[in-house]
């Protein structure tokens, strides 16, 4: 049987597709933009047919309808990341969070530590050779498809076709549902004065020829905005967003000095707007690879002049970085922060640097501020990057390097880049903590 006949025979309605899910099954979604919205909606609509179905995924941009209390007998969320649609279920006790470094997710799948019965994913229509394309993600989704007992795909012609480990043959899919839904879009964040200042500070640490890892949001975009005069920048990053396009078009990013995959931007997933997805379509400069390769610290270390930029919710006097929890509440997940912090530290040329960039304070609705630089992390908070790995901390008030400093000097450097309104209080805490004058 040829692939075209296979495809036609396996086409079905969303309802028929989700009937392949059985009570007690474990279901994994495609990551981020590859979450098949039509199939997820059909699964929730079919909830009465299920009992004890476990849902697993990393970043989800959906509403997390399956986590609502009324579905507690039907679905249970056990995620490797918490987002807006899922963190409440974990907080309320009918969902769970599973800590794992992003680079290890495909490894866990292969070793059976993260097991599932059904993979639901979004793919492009098959090409003339019978291969569908993941388009915006290789991440763990590629491995999930290879390992699942049953694979259900929403076929969406809005997905771009990309180079790398993104091709899935029709024979590997058990059911196809054609539905051209709009792709999730994450509009560029507004860059304010604080983010601009942080971007300027970070830019002073980035030389011509650097290879960058950075994420999505106002701070990464602010950093990129300050790099348009740089030459021969490269990308080896867990993800990219729209801000990278401006630097490619300006000629600042051309990957010409990369020591690994010269001339290519290496990423594991995309998250942005239609502009980014159009940029990615059939673009040989952009290559998507699984996260156990892209985020593998040993692979990251092969890039000369490597710079990683990540964020934090809190940093204490010792340099401990909290990026995925607020006290005892799980807020997100580790993502690739530690993967890249460690990879950069292992860089073979000895020039890699990692930056944790964040506003100095969080502003509450009533206008009061909470310092992100604190003597101690909050009770119950989980350390993301530990004090032995942390390198640079950047706020709008400056740069504090942690490596090469004892604990007192680390605390002094951090207090000097804290918000001016909290510095005196932090100095008092310093005296209490270290029995020494500031």
Region locations from a protein language model:
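Conserved alpha/beta enzyme-core scaffold
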Residues: 1-438
